[in-house]
């Protein structure tokens, strides 16, 4: 198979879809790999590192799309890429369709096969291609939230861990999955007073058994969240319904109960955001204010630490990339139920129920 690795063009997206080690594996299996010039530079992989393992370097993104049967990316295609995608081409990347009707319609019109990292699902309901980036995003959410609590960044000037004689910051994490617990652990490590909420009592029970002393668990409800907000300095939204649009768990009227200069970090922004007042931001303009509350809603948080996150992502994706290249997507997906669940759009048809439901469109089967 001919596999293409384009350079990511989303704002400050520094990751790359495959490392030289991954290219080496594909070449060993007899596949041809084309890499766009400079695609890996911001993750620490110069063109020469790809050439040494057998990749061919192409000058433009147009060249990569034109020649490749399978495109391996990190983030969803954006508007300049839409005309480059053709019928029958396989795209393997994060899509997050449920929050983006324009992207969904563009991919349906293209006739391409869209296989989404975020909905590949194992029998135990874990999401193996989402977990590594969730771990990174959770850690980064707390780091960035702590930064924007600083006065020069517009925050209330509060130190996460406090000092002797001064209370630490209060952190509320909504959602106790991989993102949420990663965020809570980092906040606890910084010395903050942390509360983590979830609807799953078994999950909260598990966290209660392994958590440090400064993390408390709380059942997630509108009443409980509303009660926490007046004394909370930093909120991390870490809600996930696989493939579906995130619910709004903090509404605009709740902001008035918070102190000015408090910070909301919405890690669920890829799926539409879990705060009513959320809208996507970028690494170059990461925050905005609503009613005196700072909102950090960067849609590709791990792109800021690309050297780490590219390795973490490709460690997880490579076995699936090799399967797809060796067998073709039809055979690979028919033999691997987890991979089959990654199929979102095929030949103009939505086949993932949560995406169809998000837009009131029919869900087909293949």
Where are the regions a protein language model picked out?
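Glycine/serine-rich phosphate-binding loop and adjoining beta1-alpha1 elements at the start
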Residues: 2, 8, 77-169, 298-300
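An N-terminal-biased, well-structured beta-alpha scaffold segment characteristic
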Residues: 2-110
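General beta-strand structural signal in soluble alpha/beta enzymes
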Residues: 5, 34-37, 57-59, 65, ...
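Glycine-rich phosphate/diphosphate-binding loop of Rossmann-like nucleotide-binding domains
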Residues: 6-45, 152-237, 287
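Short glycine-/small-residue-rich Rossmann-like dinucleotide-binding loops
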Residues: 69, 75-76, 95-96, 221, ...
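Adenosine-phosphate binding glycine-rich loop
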Residues: 118-144, 148-159, 269, 274-366
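Rossmann-like adenosine-cofactor binding region
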Residues: 209-291
